[in-house]
């Protein structure tokens, strides 16, 4: 299995979820071993997508270099990771990634439009060798050794539409597009009002977020999946775990996990040499374990 990048440069214009201002985003190919690099075109500053560059995980994952920051990156990174792209430059002329429809499906379509090409170097992956867990009261995130890449997530909300939800996702690109990519971010009406009073969620509305009042959802079209809420948590987790710098080969298990806990988990994994092994994905067994099924791959 080879490293991959996109074939052609693509771009779009959207708005940021929290600041609500227009932003132009361009995706460009990068050479082998470049990794994922963000670029603030308005400031002329590049920011590598690495765990040590994360500065905030309160409402979204935010990375920075000096005064330059980029926020709400997790949905885009989720799609990039799910499509097996190792090397790509993401240029933005403002500080937020466009929110699109609150899910990752728009990014998937953009990546398919760009095309995906194999490069002349082997893809690498992080194989989990022992269990590592981050706990915050009842909440936890954990990775365990596994022959397949699995995301197993549970949530429990005191709300009649959500309540307890559980979803176990065995990773493949096609399954991601069908089962995970269309799950939207969600929030509660009382939280939206509070966030806006703090200058946040200015770009959020029913076109890019599931909004719930005390007893129901306000979106007239309803849900895209029965378990859309927990599926979106998996979407977020896939994007956050991309902070490892290469694909995860192991099981991710969580109850009520968050961006903060995911970030702490990636840092803990990378700080423990006995927790993981970096392997070259040239073995067919390892390749099958990740199952990047590229319907749109071009050579």
Curated annotation (Swiss-Prot):
Reaction(s) catalysed by this chain, per the record, are: a UDP-3-O-[(3R)-3-hydroxyacyl]-N-acetyl-alpha-D-glucosamine + H2O = a UDP-3-O-[(3R)-3-hydroxyacyl]-alpha-D-glucosamine + acetate
Highest taxon, organism lineage:
Bacteria
Instruction: List ligand-binding residues for Zn(2+).
Output: 75, 232, 236
Q: List the disulfide bonds.
A: none
A single GO BP = lipid A biosynthetic process
- Metabolic or biological pathway: Glycolipid biosynthesis; lipid IV(A) biosynthesis; lipid IV(A) from (3R)-3-hydroxytetradecanoyl-[acyl-carrier-protein] and UDP-N-acetyl-alpha-D-glucosamine: step 2/6
**EC top class, in one word?**
hydrolase
- Keyword annotations: Hydrolase, Lipid A biosynthesis, Lipid biosynthesis, Lipid metabolism, Metal-binding, Zinc
Cofactor dependence is on: Zn(2+)
GO molecular function: any one? UDP-3-O-acyl-N-acetylglucosamine deacetylase activity
Instruction: Please list the residues that make up the active site.
Output: 259 (proton donor)
The record, for InterPro entries, names: Ribosomal_Su5_D2-typ_SF (IPR020568), UDP-acyl_GlcNac_deAcase (IPR004463), UDP-acyl_GlcNac_deAcase_C (IPR011334), UDP-acyl_N-AcGlcN_deAcase_N (IPR015870)
Give the Enzyme Commission number: 3.5.1.108
One GO CC term, this protein: membrane
| Similarity-based family | Belongs to the LpxC family.
PANTHER family in the record, alphabetically? UDP-3-O-ACYL-N-ACETYLGLUCOSAMINE DEACETYLASE 1, MITOCHONDRIAL-RELATED
Summary of the function given for this chain in its UniProt record = Catalyzes the hydrolysis of UDP-3-O-myristoyl-N-acetylglucosamine to form UDP-3-O-myristoylglucosamine and acetate, the committed step in lipid A biosynthesis.
By what name is this protein known? Answer: UDP-3-O-acyl-N-acetylglucosamine deacetylase
Q: Which gene encodes it?
A: lpxC
């Amino acid at each position: 299995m080879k490293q991959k990048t996109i074939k052609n440069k693509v771009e779009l214009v959207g708005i940021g979820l929290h600041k609500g201002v227009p932003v132009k985003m361009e995706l460009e190919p990068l050479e082998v071993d470049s990794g994922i690099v963000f670029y603030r075109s308005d400031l002329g500053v590049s920011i590598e997508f690495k765990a040590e560059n994360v500065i905030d995980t309160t409402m979204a994952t935010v990375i920075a270099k000096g005064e330059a920051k980029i926020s709400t990156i997790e949905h885009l990174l989720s799609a990039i990771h799910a499509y097996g792209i190792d090397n790509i430059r993401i240029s933005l002329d403002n500080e937020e990634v466009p929110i699109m429809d609150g899910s990752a499906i728009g990014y998937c379509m953009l990546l398919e439009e760009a095309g995906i090409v194999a490069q002349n170097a082997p893809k690498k992956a992080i194989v989990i060798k022992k269990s590592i867990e981050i706990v915050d009261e009842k909440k936890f995130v954990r990775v365990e050794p596994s022959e397949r890449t699995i995301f197993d997530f549970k949530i429990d909300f005191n709300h009649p539409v959500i309540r307890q939800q559980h979803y176990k996702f065995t990773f493949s690109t096609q399954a991601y597009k069908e089962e995970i990519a269309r799950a939207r971010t969600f929030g509660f009406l009382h939280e939206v009002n509070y966030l806006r009073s703090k200058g946040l969620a200015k770009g959020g509305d029913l076109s890019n977020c599931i909004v719930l009042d005390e007893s129901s959802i306000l979106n007239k079209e309803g849900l895209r999946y029965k378990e859309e809420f927990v599926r979106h948590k998996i979407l977020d987790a896939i994007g956050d775990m991309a902070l490892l710098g290469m694909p995860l080969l192991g099981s991710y298990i969580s109850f009520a996990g968050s961006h903060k806990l995911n970030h702490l988990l990636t840092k803990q994994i990378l700080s423990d040499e006995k927790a993981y092994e970096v392997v070259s994905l040239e073995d067919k067994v390892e390749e099958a374990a990740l199952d990047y099924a590229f319907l749109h791959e071009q050579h």
